[in-house]
Amino acid sequence: MNNSYGEIIKISTFGESHGLIIGALIDGFFSNLYISEKFIQKNLNLRKPFTSLFSTQRREQDKVKIFTGIFKNKTTGAPVLMLIKNNDKQSSDYNNISLNFRPGHADYTYFLKYKFRDYRGGGRSSARETACRVASGCVFKNLIYNKGVIVRSYIKKIGFLKINFKYWNYTLNRFFSNLLFINEIKDIINNCKNSCNSLSSEIVIIINGLEPSLGDPLYKKINSTISNYLLSINATKSICFGFNFKNKNSFQVKDEIKNSGFTSNNNGGILAGITNGQPLVIKILFKPTSSTSRKIKTINEKLKNITNKTYGRHDPCVGLRAVPVIESMLYTILINKILKKKIYE
């Protein structure tokens, strides 16, 4: 099982949904960088469960503790170890699936591959693991911002509801770009929960201030690296860079160049896998949460046809808590790409 990502600075995550702890180890970190648990906690609070009626009701405080690699709030260059306790586990909710596979989950494929699985909340495959990505990735946020790079994301679509972008809002809920849609969002999520269902979502990410020439041709393209990382997030099904090319011809999407710069940005800031200095535009689609409390047809480990009902506490829409995870992983990608570019300079 591969539990690490990164090129120069590498991050390893560990722990399971219903284990004692989850955590992350950052290796290859440079020294003398200020890091505070308070700053990490602020970012973790953006994704933690039980922050609204529209997320899982699992009550985890996600309190992070740094154990190594820090002295007087500065990195020493040694590996940085972070741990988060799991406090609100209800493993008994999953007793009925100890031998049954939940459709849409990792149960079936994990069992095929490893011949054994932790069925409690999905074990290692649970989105609980993404707290580790936020805790470790957000430490690069200020480094990225100090270089003039701004990473911002918003929810573009929930189920069939398209949310028209109006402005960046950082006061009430920074992930919704148009407060006029809040009541509609509440209605469709409430209706979804009441019918024991879940919804898909689409997230748009715009990165401004990226320097040109980040990324390498062919097998280390910046868009292939981003895809590799972001598609590892639970429930992601597709990723797109730039704007919709479907049913378009060349003249409609070609970004012409003048000595003053590009006249458009249909390619989303990337050409041939290398940044061109324009805003980087990414769209990610999340499938509906697989766990719902309806009875559904499946099989058990003996390949017997059965019907099964999933209990436990689950998000009605994954995208509502996905934005901090996406942004934290992008910080990790970008700092690695920036450091790698310096090697060639």
From Swiss-Prot:
Known EC number: 4.2.3.5
Cofactor(s) demanded: FMNH2
Gene Ontology biological-process entries: amino acid biosynthetic process; aromatic amino acid family biosynthetic process; chorismate biosynthetic process
Molecular functions (GO terms): chorismate synthase activity; FMN binding
Keywords: Amino-acid biosynthesis, Aromatic amino acid biosynthesis, Lyase
Pathway(s) served: Metabolic intermediate biosynthesis; chorismate biosynthesis; chorismate from D-erythrose 4-phosphate and phosphoenolpyruvate: step 7/7
InterPro entries with a match to the protein in the record: Chorismate_synth, Chorismate_synth_AroC_sf, Chorismate_synthase_CS
Transmembrane segments: none
Catalysis performed (reactions): 5-O-(1-carboxyvinyl)-3-phosphoshikimate = chorismate + phosphate
GO terms under cellular component: cytosol
Subunit-structure text: Homotetramer.
NCBIfam families per record: aroC (TIGR00033), PRK05382.1 (NF003793)
PANTHER family (UniProt xref): CHORISMATE SYNTHASE
Protein family according to the UniProt entry: Belongs to the chorismate synthase family.
Protein name stated in the entry: Chorismate synthase
Organism: Carsonella ruddii (strain PV)
